[in-house]
Amino acid sequence: MKNQLNFNIVSDEELAEVNGGSLQYVMSAGPYTWYKDTRTGKTICKQTIDTASYTFGVMAEGWGKTFH
């Protein structure tokens, strides 16, 4: 499917060059990772693992611990 809205996908490094800051890793919890924008000081949350993969991973880990 063609991108009809003409969005450009940029990496964090490219975005840092455009806005004058960079994203610094803060922490990860579950399928989410938090970054801090060094220019604005705002904390940004990105989902870095899809929900289904994370859920199945948690279930598999629990089953593995239960039956070991």
Curated annotation (Swiss-Prot):
GO biological process: defense response to bacterium; killing of cells of another organism
Documented effect of changing residue 45 to A/D/E/F/G/I/L/M/N/P/Q/S/T/V/Y/W: No loss of activity
Annotated coiled-coil segments of the chain: none
Principal location: secreted
InterPro entries per the UniProt record, alphabetical: Bacteriocin_IId, Bacteriocin_signal_seq
Secreted is among the record's keywords: yes
Compartments reported by the entry: Secreted
GO cellular component assignments: extracellular region
Entries under Pfam families matching the protein: Lactococcin
Annotated propeptide span(s): 1-21
Keywords: Antibiotic, Antimicrobial, Bacteriocin, Plasmid, Secreted
Presence of the UniProt keyword Transferase in the record: no
Functional description taken from the UniProt entry: Kills Lactococci by dissipating the membrane potential of the cells.
Protein name, entry field: Bacteriocin lactococcin-B
Source organism: Lactococcus lactis subsp. cremoris
